[in-house]
Amino acid sequence: MKPNYPLQLLCETFEVSRSGYYAQQTRLRCPGPRRQRDAELLELLQTEFAASDRTYGSPRLHRALHARQEPVSRKRVARLMRRVGLRGCSPVRRRVITTDSRHEQPIAPNLLAERSRPIRPNQVWVADITYVSTAEGWLYLAGIKDLYSRALVGWAMSEHIDTPLVQAAWRHARDHRRPQAGLLFHSDRGVQYASAAFRHDLEAAGAVQSMSRRGNCYDNAMMESGWASLKIECVYRHRFRTRAEARAAIFTYLHFYNRRRRHSALGYLSPVDFENQTN
């Protein structure tokens, strides 16, 4: 819109020189190289942010741009994100205890602490059960993670937290990955993992069972961190009306987690890319 007052009067009122006004108009019409580059980067950032289902913060978006061969500093990425209001998911502390270790079943020794870091897939798996709230009630999710690549190699969901749930997750992982005998399978001391039926499944596959020490959550920290990502980036962003809704959202997220989500511990590669790179 053109001003209704003489330019000279406006410049004097706002204490701006005529040359400064014209210089600003030129900059707006012809943005310099830095502004042009910011515009290009913003378009790429918004594309990558949408591809992550609006979960990535500046560290992962920074690595995503580098993967596109776009040199840019992390500070610049953070600045541009603030400019347009892009915000990744932030941690939320919530916890419900799912482990029932008050049982008479045998407890396996903690062999994980004695093992060196795995050097290839299917040497060490860790397992745990988590929960998801829906309007219909709890949905329980049993998962198994490969300690080498952080890939979730097996999972199962049910409205019941019982031995068949962890057996289903085990069968999913076993049939998909075909581990050799000697696989170390680590979990907490929950009755589901200590049950005779589940111990039989492991023995039949030649897997060696390991369990955390009593009351020590750090023994299974790798699995806990995976659940934290699921809760923050998927579960807490929804209000599930049904268990079926929750199942669908979780299934989609777990495939994203394995195939596309960048992990800082893997050099910001996804678990699938990390395994493909090292095989």
In which residue ranges do the predicted regions lie?
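Charged DNA-binding/catalytic regions of mobile-element recombinases
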Residues: 1-279
